[in-house]
Amino acid sequence: MTDHVREADDANIDDLLGDLGGTARAERAKLVEWLLEQGITPDEIRATNPPLLLATRHLVGDDGTYVSAREISENYGVDLELLQRVQRAVGLARVDDPDAVVHMRADGEAAARAQRFVELGLNPDQVVLVVRVLAEGLSHAAEAMRYTALEAIMRPGATELDIAKGSQALVSQIVPLLGPMIQDMLFMQLRHMMETEAVNAGERAAGKPLPGARQVTVAFADLVGFTQLGEVVSAEELGHLAGRLAGLARDLTAPPVWFIKTIGDAVMLVCPDPAPLLDTVLKLVEVVDTDNNFPRLRAGVASGMAVSRAGDWFGSPVNVASRVTGVARPGAVLVADSVREALGDAPEADGFQWSFAGPRRLRGIRGDVRLFRVRRGATRTGSGGAAQDDDLAGSSP
C-alpha cells in the first residue's frame, strides 16, 4: 500500500471516530478498520454507535439495505394492507406512508411470508394473530440468545475489536443451527397441542373451532417478599431468581398441565383437570421450600370457565386464583371452593388433605370466597369435610 493510499484510508477512518479521544479513539480506529475490511460501509458505521456488532448483524440479515412497504408489496406480491398489519404485529414501527424507505430489507421479507398462508385459505386475522404471538415469544428468545452469546465472548479488558471479532466468529457458527432448532421445537409444541387439544364433538358439529370458554383450573405461584428483596439485591440477581423459578416450574410441568407464562416473580399454570394441577403446584412449593437460595413460595388455585387467546387465559378463575395467591401464607397452597367442587364428590380421593381456611372477601371478586388449604396426606375430618386452618395472610391484595 502506497503512502498516499494509506493516508487516504487513515483520513476516512478518522472521519468515523466522532469526538472520541485518547485510548478510546485508538481502540475505535482498530475496530473501524476491521469493519471496513468486512465490507461494512462508512454510512453504516456512522449510523451505529457503538458499531461493535455490525459484522454480526450482517450475519442475521442486516445488510444495511432499506426499502418501503410498497416495494415489499410489489416485489413479493403481498397485499399492502396485510403487510402493514403484519409489520405492526411483529413490532416494527408504524409508518403510515407506504413509500417511506424505512424498513430493513430482511424484515420486509419476513413480513411478506404471511401472504402465502392467506393464499392457503387461512383467515388473515388469525394469521396476524399467529405472527404476533410468534414475534412476542421470539423476542424473548432473542434477548436470551444475545445475553448468552455475549457472556461467552466477554472477558475483562476485552477491546471493542476483540468483542466484534468474537461475536462474529461465534454467531457465524450458531446461525446455521437456529433455523432447524426453532423448527424442531415448534413442531414438538404442535405435536403435543394436537395430542392434548383434540377436536371435540361440538367443534365438529359447528364445523369450526369454538371460541367459547371452557372449564379449567388455574394456579398462580409467587415468591414471598420479592418486592422487598429488590431493595437489597441487584436487578440482575432478582432477574436470575425469577428465571430460576420459571425454569423450575417448567421442569415440574407436564401434560395435561400447561405452563402459561411468568409475571415478574410469579408463574401461571393451567389444566383442564384440577388434580394434576394441584399435584404440580404442591411439588413446586415443596421443592422451593427445601432450597435455601429461594424466598418462600405461596400459591393460589381456582376453577371455572375461562377462554384462551393467543396463549394466555382470561376469565373468572384467572382473577380468583390471582387474588387467592395474594392472601395465602408463605409455603401454603390455598384454593377456592370452586376447586373442591371441580374435583367432585370425593376431593380427598387423589391423596390431598384439606383444611378450611374460612371465607374471604377478595378485591375485585363479588361476594365471599370460601378458601381451603390443600396438602398431601391422609384426610383430616372436620366441619364440611375439612379441618379448620388459618392460612390467610393478614391483608387482602
Curated annotation (Swiss-Prot):
Binding sites annotated in the UniProt record for Mn(2+): D222, D265
GO molecular function, one term: protein homodimerization activity
Domain Guanylate cyclase: 217-325
Effect of E195A: Partially relieves high pH inhibition
Binding site for substrate: K261, D312
Cofactor: Mn(2+); Mg(2+)
EC number, as in UniProt: 4.6.1.1
Cofactor comment: The isolated catalytic domain prefers Mn(2+) over Mg(2+) as a cofactor.
Pfam families: Ad_Cy_reg, Guanylate_cyc
Annotated consequence of substituting H192E: Higher activity above pH 7.0
N-acetylthreonine modifications at: T2
Induction: A possible member of the dormancy regulon. Induced in response to reduced oxygen tension (hypoxia). It is hoped that this regulon will give insight into the latent, or dormant phase of infection.
Catalytic activity: ATP = 3',5'-cyclic AMP + diphosphate
Keyword Metal-binding set for record: yes
Catalytic domain, as annotated region: 211-397
Domain notes: Consists of 3 structural domains. The pH-responsive N-terminus inhibits the adenylyl cyclase (AC) activity of the C-terminal catalytic domain. The length of the linker segment (aa 192-206) is decisive for regulation.
Function: Catalyzes the formation of the second messenger cAMP.
PANTHER family cross-referenced by the UniProt entry: ADENYLATE CYCLASE, TERMINAL-DIFFERENTIATION SPECIFIC-RELATED, PH-SENSITIVE ADENYLATE CYCLASE RV1264
Additional remarks: Was identified as a high-confidence drug target. Binds 1 C18:1 fatty acid per monomer.
Protein name: pH-sensitive adenylate cyclase Rv1264
